[in-house]
Amino acid sequence: RCSSDSFLLVATCLRALTAMGHVTDKVELIVLGGTWSDYPESYQRWFTGELFRALNLSDEERVREATERRTWYERRGLPRDRDALAAAAAPLQQRIDAGELTYNEAWREAYSEEEVPQSCSWDDLFALHRANETAPKRVVGLVVETRPDLVTAEACRTLRALGCTKVQIGIQSLNDETLAANGRAITSARIADAMALLRQFGFKSHVHFMVNLLGADPVSDIADYRRLVTDPAFLPDEVKLYPCCLVESAQLTDCYEAGCWRPYTEEELVEVLVQDVLATPPWTRISRMIRDISATDILAGNKKTNLRQVVEAAVDATDEEVAEIRSREISVEGATVGDIAAGLAISV
């Protein structure tokens, strides 16, 4: 719908948030999906610059430019309507399905005739940064996602110049045997190097961690997570803690059918996640506990959308103290105005 245009993405989100009554004077930009550091540096500059430019414009200017951009894309064969786009691409899709073209060949045939004006110099980007310091909608955080093996000193310098404040990386496990069994092509030592670089360059770290991978078991998963949050080589600021779910297209399907991998029972999964929550230190936030995968697409594994609620109820039943950031937030416990006032008086 937005043609992967960062200006349009921001404009669309701002319109939706404003319509729902949200205040948008402070914005955290989160660029998810893909491997950010794999994109050419010129594209990274342009994409980031358009994020800032969309926030720097007035509401009227933003709406006007968004309309002009959508018209520009539609004239070049990228309509907003999904059915219209599918119809326009149908002949090429048929050739892809028949094995006559690869996806990349089809893309070049469809769109390479028009040069997309995606340009932003470092000076242009720095000017957008400075303008945003006094803009009505200010960026308070910029997050991108990449792989641990692409976290290098050079990549970190580029991220700092772009204005990034936090980096998401998919770790999944620190057990080298588990990593190898799941084709991760990386080691815990390289992950430790990536975490060290992120800290040295002043980034917050947000890692993705997965339980019930091929080769793991509940005991090893609990130990693996405990290492993540206690070993000084790691200690992330945030964690997305996911249970492994089987979808039809995954290679794990063969292992499932052969009986060499099975999903944890609900009792096993909840116990692993309970122990993970209890092990989480006070400087770490567990931001998510499931993936947004439709239950109809999951062949085996957790399908409960309220898994975190189930886990938190089990944590409460232990009567053990929870240090994890989200569990200690005022909103969770429903503090009264009097409680807040008393806290302010004590802090003063």
Which ranges hold each PLM region?
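Secondary-structure boundary/capping micro-motif
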Residues: 2-17, 22, 26-27, 42, ...
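Intrinsically disordered or highly flexible coil/loop and linker segments, enriched in small
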Residues: 19, 23, 60-61, 234, ...
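Conserved non-cysteine loop/helix-boundary elements of the Radical SAM core domain that shape
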Residues: 2-9, 33-53, 67-206, 210-267, ...
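Structural signal for hydrophobic packing residues in well-ordered secondary-structure cores
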Residues: 14, 18, 51-55, 59, ...
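C-terminal accessory regions of radical SAM enzymes
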Residues: 260-348
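Catalytic cores of glycan-processing enzymes that make or break glycosidic bonds
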Residues: 7, 59, 63, 119-128, ...
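Acidic, His- and aromatic-enriched active-site or binding-groove loops in soluble protein domains
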Residues: 52-61, 227-237, 265-266, 307-322
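Divalent metal-dependent hydrolysis catalytic cores, especially in the metallo-beta-lactamase
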Residues: 28-32
